Amino acid sequence: SVQDAMNLLNVDDFHLVHDTPDNNRDLDAKPLHSLIEIIESSSPVSLEKIEPTMVAIPTIFSHHQDHVHVHNACIAALRPISTPVSDIVLSYEAPEHSRWSATGIFEPNFFVEIDDVIDQKIQAFSKYKSQIRPGGRDADSIRNQAKYRGQEVGKNLCEAFYVHRFIL
């Protein structure tokens, strides 16, 4: 379950906007302004409530329409006129994003070495059973993607991101 994965990753609080198995099928039909409001202020873990320094969001290059919708809502909620402004905003990649997209190709410009946490990442993902499937959403695909991204930057295993904002 999501709760099991969050526990394994020591995530102390989270909010599922759609918390039943069928709800993610219509997330992209939810008005964008209502998702923006959830992200900005109404969620228990909203930007206003937790004031995160770093936020990672789905990439626009996902072939999942609900992920693209959430990406667009996040970009609007994280605009630089928001209060507070998160210093670091990144789009993350999932293994299947490099295989099929109608909107473009994920081109990362920020890499994080994950040698020490790859097993924990795979174990956490394995708790989210409804999301496991061959061809991008399985342990081998996660490890292979990390190897590929690591090779791009001369490291062993890396996770790749696209930087939207990075303020030091």
Residue ranges and their predicted role:
Residues S1-V85, V153-N156:
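Active-site beta-strand->loop->alpha-helix modules in alpha/beta enzyme cores, enriched
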Residues S1-D13, D26-K30, V85-L168:
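The feature marks non-catalytic terminal segments
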